[in-house]
Amino acid sequence: MDGFINLLKPPGMTSHDVVAYVRKKLKTGKVGHLGTLDPAAAGVLPVAVGQATRLIEYLENVAMKEYLAEIVFGITTATWDMEGEILEQKDASFLTAGDIEKVLGHFHGEIEQTPPLASAVKVSGKPLYRYQRQGEKVEPPKRKVFIDSIELLEFLADKPQPAVRLYIRCSRGTYIRSIANEIGNLLKTGATLKFLLRTRSGPFLLDDSNLLHEDFTLIPPEQLFQDFPKINLTREQYLRVKNGGGVKVETKGENFGPVFAYYGEKIIATGMICGQIFRPEKVFRFGE
């Protein structure tokens, strides 16, 4: 069994919990997920099964994520979401939709982002959340992420803590909790993430996702990599690549990759083209 499953993660489960559930349900140990979702969050969590786990990196490196987020103002927590200890509360009822629109302009294109302390980002090989749990002080490393789009969908003028609902399209590694915290800092009110729903992860859409209790739809790898560079192998080339050997291909002599090598309708290998030679890095036996 090899392929991908588009799952809808419910709130309250970790991404690892979902992987463990799938392993047990499908009776296989080869299962991995693409892109961690916080336990409190819900939404699209793609899962790879069997040999498809070796293809995860190719989707993760290019997949943009889309979210619907609700952020509440006037509340600051230790985790930057509603799961953590409340550190401060204040009246933020003076905020308007216009105030929110002004600060959203800070979150377009490539930005530097500080991840939450309650996260799996590692410093000296140790996740930040462990430093926090053990009461150790550590400086979270700033990371560059890309925000393709951020839109105000709704302003909820609740008193004393108003809220907003946002649509966000962003790159891998973006923490929506960090965006919530930074918006609160810019407005000098404090803010925290109240709810998060991931509606898209690369080619995986919320509308097509499977509930955990349903029969899973297994998506063949070939369906997801149609837009990646590819070469078609002859029978002779296939036999050579299958055993890890390189083959000559017709190119302009450029070095590039990753390239997906097909024999018939099946992905046989991924690798690089160096000069006019395709050199396989990973070889697959889908369907065998």
UniProtKB/Swiss-Prot annotation:
Superkingdom of origin: Bacteria
An example Gene Ontology molecular-function term: RNA binding
Active-site residues, Swiss-Prot/TrEMBL: 38 (nucleophile)
Enzyme class, spelled out: isomerase
Keyword field: Isomerase, tRNA processing
A matching Pfam family: TruB_N
GO biological process per UniProt: mRNA pseudouridine synthesis; tRNA pseudouridine synthesis
This enzyme's EC code(s): 5.4.99.25
Catalysed conversion reaction: uridine(55) in tRNA = pseudouridine(55) in tRNA
Family as reported in the entry's similarity comment: Belongs to the pseudouridine synthase TruB family. Type 1 subfamily.
Function: Responsible for synthesis of pseudouridine from uracil-55 in the psi GC loop of transfer RNAs.
Database matches in NCBIfam families: TruB (TIGR00431)
The name this protein goes by in its record: tRNA pseudouridine synthase B
